[in-house]
Amino acid sequence: MSEENQNKQYSEDSIQALEGMEHVRMRPSMYIGDIGVRGLHHLVYEVVDNSIDEALGGYCDEIAVTINEDNSITTKDNGRGIPVGIHKKEGVSALEVVMTKIGAGGKFDKDSYKVSGGLHGVGVSCVNALSEQLTATVYRDGKVWEQTYQRGKALEPVKTVGESSETGTLVTFKPDAEIFIQTREYSYETLSLRMRELAYLNKGITITITDRREKEESGEFKSETFLSEKGLVEFIHFLDESREAIISDVIAMEGEKNGVPVEVAMIYNTSYSENLHSYVNNINTHEGGTHLAGFRRGLTSTLKKYADSSGLLDKLKFEIAGDDFREGLTAIISVKVGEPQFEGQTKTKLGNREVTSAVSQAVSEMLENYLEENPNDAKTIVQKVILAAQARHAAKKAREMVQRKTVMSGGGLPGKLSDCSEQDPALCEVFLVEGDSAGGTAKQGRDRNFQAILPLRGKILNVEKAMQHKVFENEEIRNIYTALGVTIGTEEDSKALNLEKLRYHKVVIMCDADVDGSHISTLILTFFFRYMRELIESGYIYIATPPLYLVKKGQKKDYAWSDDQRDRLMQEFGSGSSVQRYKGLGEMNAEQLWDTTMNPQERTLRIVNIDNVGEADRVFSMLMGDEVPPRREFIEKNAIYANIDV
């Protein structure tokens, strides 16, 4: 890297150790969120965050992440290398301090890093504590330094193992089987999505991810390289690739307001949904916060002022609301904050008050300039806002109908709902079943103490293509709202989902195991993602997995959920075995449906969660939206994985 910023010395004296490691192995979830799939991947993010911090300081422009054959991870950067000199206070190498003390690192020394990433901010020492083995290799001062640890403890002092003119840090770690008992298998897709996101958020950095467990047809290991020259502008194009823009190009700005670095990029499209993605120091703030509030304030006030002065609102008979300015808007807000304060349920809501005015001012200035210089686009945006206001007005009446019907007790429940007798929502589950015939079988097969059945007639409305009032007028969707007991509107937000009277804590989508069933599942999931995302985020949405085959021979029978499983059973049963392919739930009798799909002791339910909101938004838009080419490309790319009924 270049010599710029070298005046800020990064040495052993920059390292501050805040506390010991005692708690990490005993209470890992306090440090990395959980010890399941998310926590496992979070280890990688913590190590990569160190490299990103170097990049933010201008010291690093290449980061490489490798999933090794044994599911260990190697990360490498071309930064300055972690200091290796003796730490004054601790009396050991600064590298050992960084690797073995929680919170130790240059990110707590304001001269070394102005801002720093990492949601939990626990750093690489936490990764070390939760790894059965970790080796840190540092390229610095013309030498190669190395130290190996087991479960957070150094096996020997830092030693030199060679000479090199390179600079940087290389870390290889293997998660500890004693901690990660659920899985230690890394998902290439999950890591790849995060690396792509980081490349967009930090333009000019080359990030490579390689999977040494899998080879391409060329014989090379599976690998991708991400480099974004335009940052958020390219990120918007990526997120909106399957939507049709209504303005000529992305509106973007980058600068500093009141000491807060702010980056914003936005575009309007023909969709009816609002897609705002906010980041603080590269962390995706799902719950929003002061930066998002500042964006909304700046957007609404500037567009309202322009719309009023343009005369285009003169014939409108009702007030424009803030939501109207955000329909069909895709925007990314990224801020860098020296000492972020996180709040909210998952600590992903920014609380720093000074950020609101900084973002609001930045957005106002950006939009004022853009609207002045692009009058045609300005007019298009205002017309879109007017249409949104008219649709909102119509949707309000439809929403009130849903509200009234839902609030009614007893008699307000849909006629088709076969309810359960249990009153405690935490113990209750409802199955959303496709079609009346399958619904009938499910009603006979269920345990009516705690299992309710709501049959859905055919394919529900594709909400991705529908205006809001059409969604609330749709009978099947109204039945879902009413059956679940979910209402719209809280004290804080008239449009927010109110889960206070949710009647079931397991909402199970149960569709046929064929192409039509998958389509219906996707339609229902699209509805939940766009209109009831809180249910997904709270862990209430599940997908049932009915078997694909019944394999029989004489009195012996067993079920198969995949072709491989079917083949194994046929081999096990020997010649004379027969196979029945279940194309629909209705082909099973009530006892079979209970045994395979509904019995809590035997069934497999897949919980629906959102790892990456931006990617989920992009995929729903691509699969269910208007644009055909991206969908065709996706299907061609993934056809190999599909189980298609002909």
Task: Give the predicted meaning of each segment.
Residues 85-90, 291, 322, 469:
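Conserved, non-catalytic sequence blocks in retroelement Pol enzymes and Pol-derived host proteins
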Residues 26-45:
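Conserved short strand/loop->alpha-helix "switch" segment adjacent to the catalytic nucleotide/phosphoryl-transfer site
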Residues 1-14, 21, 43-45, 53-55, ...:
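GHKL-family ATPase ATP-binding module
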Residues 390-409, 424-429, 440, 444-446, ...:
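C-terminal interaction appendages of subunits in large macromolecular complexes
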Residues 53-54, 81-82, 515-516:
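Residues immediately C-terminal
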Residues 82-104:
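Short conserved segment of the HATPase_c
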